[in-house]
Protein backbone atom coordinates (compact mmCIF):
# COMPACT_ATOMS: atom_id res chain seq x y z
CA UNK A 1 0.00 0.00 0.00
CA UNK A 2 1.41 3.38 -1.00
CA UNK A 3 1.76 6.11 1.59
CA UNK A 4 2.13 9.83 0.99
CA UNK A 5 5.93 10.38 0.98
CA UNK A 6 7.53 12.52 3.66
CA UNK A 7 10.30 13.62 1.32
CA UNK A 8 10.35 13.89 -2.43
CA UNK A 9 12.47 11.93 -4.88
CA UNK A 10 14.79 13.33 -7.56
CA UNK A 11 13.11 14.02 -10.90
CA UNK A 12 14.98 11.32 -12.81
CA UNK A 13 14.20 8.71 -10.19
CA UNK A 14 10.50 9.52 -10.41
CA UNK A 15 10.58 9.25 -14.20
CA UNK A 16 12.43 5.95 -14.02
CA UNK A 17 9.86 4.59 -11.58
CA UNK A 18 7.05 5.60 -13.90
CA UNK A 19 8.78 3.99 -16.85
CA UNK A 20 9.17 0.76 -14.92
CA UNK A 21 5.59 0.69 -13.61
CA UNK A 22 4.05 1.31 -17.04
CA UNK A 23 6.06 -1.34 -18.90
CA UNK A 24 3.05 -3.64 -18.74
CA UNK A 25 0.90 -1.11 -20.62
CA UNK A 26 0.17 -1.66 -24.28
CA UNK A 27 0.96 1.37 -26.41
CA UNK A 28 -0.32 2.45 -29.80
CA UNK A 29 3.26 2.48 -31.08
CA UNK A 30 3.69 -1.18 -30.08
CA UNK A 31 1.60 -2.33 -33.02
CA UNK A 32 -0.50 -4.57 -30.79
CA UNK A 33 -3.60 -2.48 -30.04
CA UNK A 34 -6.34 -3.55 -32.45
CA UNK A 35 -9.46 -3.23 -30.32
CA UNK A 36 -9.47 0.42 -29.27
CA UNK A 37 -11.57 3.26 -30.64
CA UNK A 38 -8.82 5.67 -29.62
CA UNK A 39 -5.48 6.11 -31.33
CA UNK A 40 -2.11 7.78 -31.05
CA UNK A 41 -2.84 11.51 -31.21
CA UNK A 42 -1.52 13.43 -34.20
CA UNK A 43 1.91 14.95 -33.51
CA UNK A 44 0.59 18.49 -34.00
CA UNK A 45 -2.16 17.85 -31.46
CA UNK A 46 0.40 16.63 -28.92
CA UNK A 47 2.49 19.77 -29.42
CA UNK A 48 -0.50 22.08 -29.05
CA UNK A 49 -1.86 20.21 -26.02
CA UNK A 50 1.47 20.46 -24.20
CA UNK A 51 1.92 24.14 -25.06
CA UNK A 52 -1.49 25.20 -23.74
CA UNK A 53 -1.91 22.69 -20.93
CA UNK A 54 -2.72 25.42 -18.36
CA UNK A 55 -5.90 26.62 -20.09
CA UNK A 56 -9.12 26.00 -18.13
CA UNK A 57 -12.41 26.41 -19.97
CA UNK A 58 -14.22 25.94 -16.68
CA UNK A 59 -13.35 29.59 -16.08
CA UNK A 60 -13.59 30.98 -19.62
CA UNK A 61 -13.36 34.60 -18.53
CA UNK A 62 -9.68 34.03 -17.79
CA UNK A 63 -9.07 32.57 -21.24
CA UNK A 64 -11.25 34.50 -23.72
CA UNK A 65 -9.06 33.48 -26.65
CA UNK A 66 -9.50 29.80 -25.87
CA UNK A 67 -13.23 30.32 -25.36
CA UNK A 68 -13.50 31.92 -28.80
CA UNK A 69 -11.59 29.04 -30.35
CA UNK A 70 -14.05 26.56 -28.82
CA UNK A 71 -16.85 28.47 -30.52
CA UNK A 72 -14.95 28.13 -33.81
CA UNK A 73 -14.51 24.39 -33.25
CA UNK A 74 -18.25 23.97 -32.71
CA UNK A 75 -18.88 26.02 -35.85
CA UNK A 76 -16.53 23.82 -37.90
CA UNK A 77 -17.99 20.58 -36.54
CA UNK A 78 -21.50 21.91 -37.15
CA UNK A 79 -20.54 22.67 -40.75
CA UNK A 80 -19.15 19.14 -41.16
CA UNK A 81 -22.50 17.85 -39.89
CA UNK A 82 -24.57 20.07 -42.22
CA UNK A 83 -25.72 22.59 -39.62
CA UNK A 84 -25.31 26.30 -40.26
CA UNK A 85 -25.32 27.28 -36.59
CA UNK A 86 -24.82 24.75 -33.81
CA UNK A 87 -24.54 25.03 -30.05
CA UNK A 88 -22.32 22.85 -27.91
CA UNK A 89 -19.02 22.12 -26.27
CA UNK A 90 -15.93 19.96 -26.43
CA UNK A 91 -16.31 17.69 -23.41
CA UNK A 92 -14.58 14.74 -21.75
CA UNK A 93 -15.87 12.16 -24.21
CA UNK A 94 -18.86 10.46 -25.74
CA UNK A 95 -20.18 9.45 -22.33
CA UNK A 96 -20.49 13.02 -21.11
CA UNK A 97 -21.89 14.13 -24.47
CA UNK A 98 -24.61 11.47 -24.38
CA UNK A 99 -25.50 12.30 -20.78
CA UNK A 100 -25.81 15.98 -21.71
CA UNK A 101 -28.17 15.16 -24.57
CA UNK A 102 -30.42 13.05 -22.33
CA UNK A 103 -30.34 15.77 -19.65
CA UNK A 104 -31.38 18.39 -22.19
CA UNK A 105 -34.26 16.26 -23.48
CA UNK A 106 -35.42 15.54 -19.93
CA UNK A 107 -35.23 19.16 -18.79
CA UNK A 108 -37.25 20.41 -21.75
CA UNK A 109 -39.90 17.71 -21.47
CA UNK A 110 -42.85 17.91 -19.09
CA UNK A 111 -43.20 14.12 -18.84
CA UNK A 112 -43.79 12.98 -15.26
CA UNK A 113 -42.07 9.62 -15.78
CA UNK A 114 -39.56 10.33 -18.56
CA UNK A 115 -38.57 7.53 -20.92
CA UNK A 116 -35.84 7.33 -23.55
CA UNK A 117 -36.11 4.89 -26.46
CA UNK A 118 -32.77 3.52 -27.63
CA UNK A 119 -31.39 0.51 -29.54
CA UNK A 120 -30.11 -2.54 -27.72
CA UNK A 121 -26.80 -1.74 -29.42
CA UNK A 122 -26.50 1.62 -27.61
CA UNK A 123 -23.41 2.51 -25.59
CA UNK A 124 -23.38 1.88 -21.84
CA UNK A 125 -23.16 5.62 -21.24
CA UNK A 126 -26.94 5.76 -21.65
CA UNK A 127 -27.31 3.39 -18.71
CA UNK A 128 -25.35 5.89 -16.65
CA UNK A 129 -27.52 8.70 -17.99
CA UNK A 130 -30.71 6.87 -17.07
CA UNK A 131 -29.54 6.18 -13.54
CA UNK A 132 -28.21 9.70 -12.95
CA UNK A 133 -31.18 11.53 -14.43
CA UNK A 134 -34.07 9.31 -13.38
CA UNK A 135 -34.94 8.47 -16.98
CA UNK A 136 -36.34 5.03 -17.79
CA UNK A 137 -34.57 3.35 -20.68
CA UNK A 138 -36.84 1.60 -23.17
CA UNK A 139 -34.78 -0.76 -25.30
CA UNK A 140 -35.69 -1.26 -28.96
CA UNK A 141 -34.96 -4.54 -30.72
CA UNK A 142 -32.38 -4.96 -33.47
CA UNK A 143 -32.97 -6.44 -36.91
CA UNK A 144 -30.95 -9.31 -38.34
CA UNK A 145 -28.39 -6.83 -39.68
CA UNK A 146 -27.93 -5.45 -36.12
CA UNK A 147 -29.44 -2.06 -36.96
CA UNK A 148 -32.31 -0.85 -34.80
CA UNK A 149 -35.81 -1.98 -35.73
CA UNK A 150 -37.55 1.33 -36.45
CA UNK A 151 -40.98 -0.30 -36.25
CA UNK A 152 -40.19 -1.46 -32.72
CA UNK A 153 -39.05 2.06 -31.83
CA UNK A 154 -42.41 3.40 -32.99
CA UNK A 155 -44.30 0.74 -31.06
CA UNK A 156 -42.60 1.85 -27.85
CA UNK A 157 -43.38 5.56 -28.12
CA UNK A 158 -45.60 6.79 -25.29
CA UNK A 159 -46.69 10.03 -23.64
CA UNK A 160 -43.61 9.68 -21.42
CA UNK A 161 -41.11 9.49 -24.30
CA UNK A 162 -38.68 12.41 -24.02
CA UNK A 163 -36.35 11.35 -26.82
CA UNK A 164 -35.15 8.73 -29.27
CA UNK A 165 -31.55 7.62 -29.78
CA UNK A 166 -29.99 6.37 -33.01
CA UNK A 167 -26.41 5.14 -33.38
CA UNK A 168 -24.06 6.13 -36.19
CA UNK A 169 -21.32 3.57 -35.65
CA UNK A 170 -22.19 1.07 -32.93
CA UNK A 171 -19.41 0.15 -30.53
CA UNK A 172 -19.38 -3.53 -31.34
CA UNK A 173 -20.00 -3.69 -35.08
CA UNK A 174 -19.81 -0.15 -36.45
CA UNK A 175 -23.41 -0.35 -37.64
CA UNK A 176 -25.14 2.85 -38.70
CA UNK A 177 -28.82 2.80 -37.82
CA UNK A 178 -31.48 3.96 -40.28
CA UNK A 179 -31.23 7.53 -39.04
CA UNK A 180 -33.38 8.95 -41.89
CA UNK A 181 -36.28 6.70 -40.81
CA UNK A 182 -35.74 7.60 -37.15
CA UNK A 183 -35.70 11.27 -38.11
CA UNK A 184 -39.03 10.93 -39.92
CA UNK A 185 -40.45 9.13 -36.90
CA UNK A 186 -39.18 11.80 -34.51
CA UNK A 187 -40.76 14.56 -36.57
CA UNK A 188 -44.05 12.72 -36.90
CA UNK A 189 -44.39 12.35 -33.14
CA UNK A 190 -42.73 15.63 -32.16
CA UNK A 191 -39.94 13.89 -30.24
CA UNK A 192 -36.27 14.96 -30.38
CA UNK A 193 -33.75 12.54 -31.90
CA UNK A 194 -30.20 12.23 -30.56
CA UNK A 195 -27.57 10.58 -32.76
CA UNK A 196 -24.63 8.97 -31.00
CA UNK A 197 -21.94 9.43 -33.66
CA UNK A 198 -19.09 9.33 -31.15
CA UNK A 199 -17.24 7.01 -33.52
CA UNK A 200 -18.94 7.55 -36.86
CA UNK A 201 -18.93 11.34 -36.75
CA UNK A 202 -15.32 11.53 -37.89
CA UNK A 203 -15.76 8.66 -40.37
CA UNK A 204 -19.08 8.86 -42.21
CA UNK A 205 -18.77 12.32 -43.83
CA UNK A 206 -15.41 11.39 -45.33
CA UNK A 207 -16.38 7.82 -46.24
CA UNK A 208 -19.48 9.07 -48.07
CA UNK A 209 -17.30 11.48 -50.07
CA UNK A 210 -15.19 8.46 -51.07
CA UNK A 211 -18.24 6.70 -52.47
CA UNK A 212 -19.13 4.37 -49.60
CA UNK A 213 -22.87 3.74 -49.45
CA UNK A 214 -23.82 4.95 -45.98
CA UNK A 215 -27.05 6.50 -44.74
CA UNK A 216 -27.36 10.16 -43.83
CA UNK A 217 -27.02 10.61 -40.09
CA UNK A 218 -26.55 14.29 -39.32
CA UNK A 219 -28.38 17.61 -39.16
CA UNK A 220 -29.28 17.34 -42.83
CA UNK A 221 -32.14 15.29 -41.36
CA UNK A 222 -34.64 17.67 -39.76
CA UNK A 223 -35.56 15.35 -36.90
CA UNK A 224 -32.01 15.23 -35.55
CA UNK A 225 -31.72 17.63 -32.61
CA UNK A 226 -28.32 16.65 -31.18
CA UNK A 227 -25.21 14.70 -32.14
CA UNK A 228 -22.32 13.25 -30.18
CA UNK A 229 -19.03 13.37 -32.10
CA UNK A 230 -15.65 12.49 -30.59
CA UNK A 231 -12.49 14.15 -31.93
CA UNK A 232 -10.37 11.87 -29.74
CA UNK A 233 -11.38 8.84 -31.80
CA UNK A 234 -10.90 9.07 -35.58
CA UNK A 235 -10.28 12.80 -35.21
CA UNK A 236 -6.84 11.93 -33.73
CA UNK A 237 -7.11 14.49 -30.92
CA UNK A 238 -5.62 13.86 -27.47
CA UNK A 239 -7.85 12.42 -24.78
CA UNK A 240 -10.11 13.95 -23.48
CA UNK A 241 -11.98 15.42 -26.44
CA UNK A 242 -15.59 14.44 -26.99
CA UNK A 243 -18.17 16.70 -28.55
CA UNK A 244 -21.86 17.52 -28.19
CA UNK A 245 -23.71 19.68 -30.71
CA UNK A 246 -27.34 20.80 -30.46
CA UNK A 247 -29.42 22.13 -33.32
CA UNK A 248 -31.13 24.70 -31.09
CA UNK A 249 -29.84 26.94 -28.33
CA UNK A 250 -32.78 26.01 -26.10
CA UNK A 251 -31.20 22.63 -25.36
CA UNK A 252 -27.96 24.19 -24.16
CA UNK A 253 -29.88 26.71 -22.06
CA UNK A 254 -31.91 23.89 -20.51
CA UNK A 255 -28.79 22.31 -19.00
CA UNK A 256 -26.90 25.49 -18.05
CA UNK A 257 -26.33 26.49 -14.44
CA UNK A 258 -24.88 29.72 -13.08
CA UNK A 259 -21.32 29.65 -11.76
CA UNK A 260 -21.12 33.07 -10.05
CA UNK A 261 -17.80 32.89 -8.20
CA UNK A 262 -15.25 32.36 -10.98
CA UNK A 263 -12.16 34.53 -11.19
CA UNK A 264 -12.98 35.42 -14.77
CA UNK A 265 -16.52 36.47 -13.90
CA UNK A 266 -19.83 34.65 -13.52
CA UNK A 267 -20.77 32.34 -16.35
CA UNK A 268 -23.51 29.92 -17.35
CA UNK A 269 -22.04 26.42 -17.55
CA UNK A 270 -23.67 23.54 -19.43
CA UNK A 271 -21.08 20.77 -19.13
CA UNK A 272 -20.98 18.15 -16.37
CA UNK A 273 -17.35 18.84 -15.58
CA UNK A 274 -16.53 22.21 -14.09
CA UNK A 275 -12.81 22.41 -14.71
CA UNK A 276 -12.37 21.60 -18.40
CA UNK A 277 -9.10 21.32 -20.36
CA UNK A 278 -8.79 24.12 -22.88
CA UNK A 279 -5.77 22.34 -24.33
CA UNK A 280 -8.07 19.69 -25.78
CA UNK A 281 -10.12 22.33 -27.58
CA UNK A 282 -7.03 24.03 -28.98
CA UNK A 283 -5.64 20.71 -30.20
CA UNK A 284 -8.91 19.90 -31.99
CA UNK A 285 -8.94 23.34 -33.62
CA UNK A 286 -5.33 22.93 -34.76
CA UNK A 287 -6.00 19.49 -36.26
CA UNK A 288 -9.07 20.56 -38.19
CA UNK A 289 -7.24 23.59 -39.55
CA UNK A 290 -4.14 21.54 -40.42
CA UNK A 291 -5.76 18.44 -41.93
CA UNK A 292 -8.93 19.90 -43.40
CA UNK A 293 -11.55 17.76 -45.11
CA UNK A 294 -9.02 16.34 -47.57
CA UNK A 295 -6.62 15.27 -44.82
CA UNK A 296 -9.30 13.48 -42.84
CA UNK A 297 -10.67 11.88 -46.00
CA UNK A 298 -7.25 10.35 -46.65
CA UNK A 299 -7.07 9.01 -43.08
CA UNK A 300 -10.51 7.46 -43.47
CA UNK A 301 -9.70 6.08 -46.93
CA UNK A 302 -6.76 4.10 -45.56
CA UNK A 303 -8.77 2.82 -42.61
CA UNK A 304 -11.74 1.76 -44.73
CA UNK A 305 -9.61 0.03 -47.36
CA UNK A 306 -7.63 -1.88 -44.74
CA UNK A 307 -10.82 -2.97 -42.99
CA UNK A 308 -12.27 -4.30 -46.24
CA UNK A 309 -9.07 -6.21 -47.02
CA UNK A 310 -9.11 -7.74 -43.54
CA UNK A 311 -12.75 -8.76 -43.89
CA UNK A 312 -11.93 -10.65 -47.09
CA UNK A 313 -9.04 -12.40 -45.32
CA UNK A 314 -11.35 -13.52 -42.51
CA UNK A 315 -13.69 -15.03 -45.11
CA UNK A 316 -10.83 -17.27 -46.28
CA UNK A 317 -10.45 -18.89 -42.84
CA UNK A 318 -12.13 -22.22 -42.10
CA UNK A 319 -12.90 -21.62 -38.43
CA UNK A 320 -13.77 -17.91 -38.42
CA UNK A 321 -16.58 -15.91 -39.98
CA UNK A 322 -17.81 -12.34 -40.11
CA UNK A 323 -20.70 -11.31 -37.88
CA UNK A 324 -21.84 -9.04 -40.73
CA UNK A 325 -20.31 -7.11 -43.61
CA UNK A 326 -18.59 -4.01 -42.21
CA UNK A 327 -20.20 -0.59 -42.68
CA UNK A 328 -17.40 1.50 -41.19
CA UNK A 329 -13.78 0.70 -40.29
CA UNK A 330 -14.77 -1.91 -37.70
CA UNK A 331 -14.70 -5.63 -38.47
CA UNK A 332 -16.09 -8.18 -36.03
CA UNK A 333 -15.82 -11.92 -36.42
CA UNK A 334 -16.69 -15.11 -34.59
CA UNK A 335 -14.74 -18.32 -34.15
CA UNK A 336 -15.19 -21.73 -32.67
CA UNK A 337 -14.04 -21.80 -29.04
CA UNK A 338 -14.11 -18.01 -28.96
CA UNK A 339 -12.97 -17.56 -25.35
CA UNK A 340 -10.03 -19.89 -25.88
CA UNK A 341 -9.06 -18.01 -29.05
CA UNK A 342 -9.37 -14.68 -27.27
CA UNK A 343 -7.21 -15.81 -24.34
CA UNK A 344 -4.48 -17.13 -26.63
CA UNK A 345 -4.41 -13.97 -28.76
CA UNK A 346 -4.17 -11.82 -25.65
CA UNK A 347 -1.42 -14.09 -24.31
CA UNK A 348 0.48 -13.27 -27.49
CA UNK A 349 0.16 -9.59 -26.65
CA UNK A 350 -2.78 -8.50 -28.78
CA UNK A 351 -5.00 -5.76 -27.44
CA UNK A 352 -8.31 -6.95 -28.85
CA UNK A 353 -11.90 -6.49 -27.81
CA UNK A 354 -14.13 -9.53 -27.42
CA UNK A 355 -17.68 -9.13 -26.20
CA UNK A 356 -21.19 -10.25 -27.10
CA UNK A 357 -19.75 -13.35 -28.68
CA UNK A 358 -17.29 -11.94 -31.20
CA UNK A 359 -13.85 -10.37 -31.60
CA UNK A 360 -13.81 -6.75 -32.75
CA UNK A 361 -10.97 -5.14 -34.71
CA UNK A 362 -11.05 -1.35 -35.06
CA UNK A 363 -8.98 0.04 -37.93
CA UNK A 364 -7.73 3.25 -36.36
CA UNK A 365 -5.03 5.48 -37.91
CA UNK A 366 -2.25 3.73 -35.97
CA UNK A 367 -3.19 0.32 -37.40
CA UNK A 368 -1.02 -0.71 -40.35
CA UNK A 369 -1.30 -3.56 -42.83
CA UNK A 370 1.90 -5.05 -41.39
CA UNK A 371 0.28 -5.18 -37.94
CA UNK A 372 -2.83 -6.82 -39.33
CA UNK A 373 -0.82 -9.39 -41.31
CA UNK A 374 1.03 -10.33 -38.11
CA UNK A 375 -2.29 -10.64 -36.29
CA UNK A 376 -3.66 -12.88 -39.04
CA UNK A 377 -0.61 -15.14 -38.78
CA UNK A 378 -1.24 -15.55 -35.06
CA UNK A 379 -4.96 -16.03 -35.60
CA UNK A 380 -4.37 -18.80 -38.16
CA UNK A 381 -2.05 -20.60 -35.73
CA UNK A 382 -4.50 -20.27 -32.86
CA UNK A 383 -7.37 -21.57 -34.99
CA UNK A 384 -5.52 -24.75 -36.01
UniProtKB/Swiss-Prot annotation:
Signal peptide: none annotated. HAMAP family: MfnA_decarbox. The lineage of its organism: Archaea, Methanobacteriati, Methanobacteriota, Thermococci, Thermococcales. Belongs to the group II decarboxylase family. MfnA subfamily. It is an enzyme of class 4 (lyase). It catalyses: L-aspartate + H(+) = beta-alanine + CO2. The keyword Lyase applies. Keywords: Decarboxylase, Lyase, Pyridoxal phosphate. NCBIfam families: tyr_de_CO2_Arch. Its EC number is 4.1.1.11. It comes from Pyrococcus abyssi (strain GE5 / Orsay). The keyword Protein biosynthesis does not apply. Gene3D superfamilies: Aspartate Aminotransferase, domain 1, Type I PLP-dependent aspartate aminotransferase-like (Major domain). It comes from the Archaea. One of its GO terms (molecular function) is pyridoxal phosphate binding. Pathway: Cofactor biosynthesis; coenzyme A biosynthesis. This is Probable L-aspartate decarboxylase.
Amino acid sequence: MSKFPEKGLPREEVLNLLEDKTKVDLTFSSGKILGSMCTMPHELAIEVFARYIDRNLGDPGLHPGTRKIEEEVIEMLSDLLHLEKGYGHIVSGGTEANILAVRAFRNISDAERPELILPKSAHFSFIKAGEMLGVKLVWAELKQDYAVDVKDVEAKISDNTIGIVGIAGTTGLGVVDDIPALSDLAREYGIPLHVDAAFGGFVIPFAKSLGYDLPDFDFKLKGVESITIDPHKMGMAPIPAGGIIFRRKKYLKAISVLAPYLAGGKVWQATITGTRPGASVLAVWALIKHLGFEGYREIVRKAMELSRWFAEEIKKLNNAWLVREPMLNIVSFQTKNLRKVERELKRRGWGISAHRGYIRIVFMPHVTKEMVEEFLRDLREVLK
